[in-house]
Design a protein with these regions (language model features):
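Thiamine diphosphate
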Residues: 1-120, 127, 131-155, 159-222
Length: 222
């Protein structure tokens, strides 16, 4: 499905999220359309995004969109339970969630269990869900969004859970910044100082690079 279709269906003027490779099409589209602006905010974590979304709704009355990888669901539990839920302030929000570790789909080890519990976690937070796959049609998406509008009107949140390869975007975005060092170079400097001291790092590429640097240096991983 073209990501432009999803954008039209969601019909929101405010997006905030944490970039995810599974949602690369959406991330690239938003950078092309909005850049980093009052319409598109990239935050440090998914909880921050949800709080920003709540503030946007309270200020404008417009339903916001929060996008993220499913590994960030744990970070939204507190703001969803304490701010968004219809038993609290009834702030509606649309979540777009990249589904890593989907059962039956090969993925990295850290995504396996998260993928298994993704839909159940959203259900436990009283967030209605719809899974978008390669086979999902435009008509199905519009019909589900029409149903979701009634849910949002009642102050509840909804989530579109996106399978691998479900979204497409034709333009290629070249990312750049003015930082002088790449992440791997920063890690190399940290390892040089800490030597054999234990290091706790986030899952994903940072940990893989840290592992490779320590391997190259003949250091252990205990």
């Amino acid at each position: 499905m073209r990501v432009e279709t999803l954008f039209d269906v969601l019909d929101s003027d405010f997006y905030t999220g944490v970039p995810d490779s599974q949602l690369q099409a959406l991330c690239n589209f938003l950078i092309d359309k909005y850049g980093i602006s009052e319409h598109h905010v990239i935050a440090a974590n998914e909880g921050n995004c949800t709080a920003l979304a709540a503030g946007h709704y309270l200020a404008t009355g417009n339903v916001p969109v929060v996008y993220m990888q499913n590994s960030g669901i744990g970070n939204i539990i507190k703001p969803v339970a304490s701010l968004l839920n219809d038993k609290v302030y009834a702030i509606p929000c649309i979540f777009v969630v990249g589904w890593r570790g989907e059962p039956g789909i090969h993925d990295e080890p850290q995504h396996i269990y998260q993928g298994e519990v993704t839909l159940k976690l959203l259900e436990d937070m009283d967030i209605a869900t719809f899974v978008i796959g390669k086979e999902t049609t435009e008509a199905e998406l519009y019909a589900k969004m029409k149903e979701f509008r009634n849910v949002l009107t009642n102050g509840k949140s909804v989530a579109f859970v996106v399978r691998k390869g479900a979204l497409e975007y034709g333009n290629k975005v070249v990312y750049s910044n003015e930082y002088q060092m790449k992440r791997e170079e920063v890690l190399e400097h940290i390892v040089a100082v800490t030597e054999n001291d234990p290091i706790v790092s986030t899952t994903g590429k940072a940990s893989r690079e840290l592992f490779e640097i320590r391997e190259r240096n003949g250091q252990g991983h205990e």
